[in-house]
Amino acid sequence: YHAFLEGDVEARPNLEVICGAHVTRVVLDGDPGELRATGVEYRTADGETAVAWADKEVVLSAGAVGSPQILMLSGIGPRSELEAVGVDCRLDAPDVGKHLKDHLQVGLLYPAPGIGVSMGQMGLSMGPDALRAPAGPLPADPADDADLPEALGALKTEAERRVTEWATTGHGLVSSSLYEACAWFSTGLGDDHTHDAQLGFFICGYNEDIWRGCLRVDPSEYFDDPEERLAPDAESVIVLANPVQPHSEGEIVLTSADPLDHPDIRMNYYGDPYDMEVMVAVLRRALDVVANWPAPRQLGPLLVPPALAAEHGYAPGDTPSDDLLVDMARHYSFTVYHLTSTCRMGSVVDERLRVLGVDGLRVADASVMPNVTSGNTNAVAIMIGEKAAEMLAEDHGVALAEVVASPA
């Protein structure tokens, strides 16, 4: 919003942003072989159905789950799957929703007194609002701060100081992404000319909300002493192991013709055994990096869930076996939210992001990537949007604004 819409852009007369709307389908005119997108049907926040008509083109940008879902709800997709849920197939496009790719990661958690950042320090650095009830010790209503006990008053003052430090100097813990270091390398299992692995260094552990809400893991199953490990002053670090060129492919499949029903997201993680082989190699490299950490800043022993440690005879300080690493990957891998390739270029869209077989319809998001990138997808997704805008301008004879270089 801040980068692309805020200010003059959102005030333009040719831009209307409709909040709370849910696109239900692309409106198609014509017979097979002569299909054209003429608008999008959507439901408003009030539940009313409306149509936004297109003078020139419709551009979908709903992501690697949403874009193929909208295409299929519009009748563009694998014929047998559409007919199975009662959607009239307007264009048999077998690859819509297929070839789903994503990055997986496994976090290796290490106690790191004096090195890692505690969750308490993280909360303090995010300012007073992050410390308010119900989750924090400060009152929910700032008006009640006048009667704070001395200790809580000092806590609030320090939180304000840290936010001010960041706002005025750009320094301080709040300026950190927490993902403080990264490494890319080749495991040697794939193409030697490209990297297939990534390591990340996360300078704090996870709190209980992240364990339960994001990772879907019960901390009492991962730790012998969850209260100690998740205490606000516990200092930990996480080394994230990411294979970045997975071979396994999943798919997006409609569960019904109702646009408000979530599609079936079949990730098929580790469906190709090669991906597990690479994950073990990446974990092994991560362990090697930690084992060779500079002496004054050594991390504690790797924390392994008690049940897996007992099953594999692992004791703190041991070198984990490959079988243990496989089990850790199977039980504790989690998504990096890098879903791509479900409307991929070459089989669903052409080199200018136009949907094959339909005039006036493009897709511009991570779903058009032929394969997932060998690293984070955020910058690539932004680039796709920028390039799509450029292509639209070129194809419709709209002059592009000159790029003004910033002064050196």
Task: Outline where the language-model segments fall.
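Short beta-strand to alpha-helix junction loop
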Residues: 1-10, 18-20
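A conserved short coil-to-beta-strand element within the FAD-binding core of flavoproteins
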Residues: 19-36
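Core beta-strand elements of the Rossmann-like FAD/NAD(P) dinucleotide-binding domain
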Residues: 46-62
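Mid-to-C-terminal "cap/lid" subdomains and adjacent gly/pro-rich loops that border
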Residues: 68, 72, 78-233, 243, ...
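Helix-rich C-terminal "cap"/substrate-channel and partner-interaction subdomain
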Residues: 240, 247-334, 368, 373
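FAD-binding beta-loop-beta segment adjacent to the flavin cofactor pocket
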Residues: 241-256, 342-362
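Short FAD-binding loop at a beta-strand-to-alpha-helix junction that anchors the flavin cofactor
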Residues: 357-373
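A conserved FAD-binding loop/helix module that cradles the flavin
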Residues: 371-392
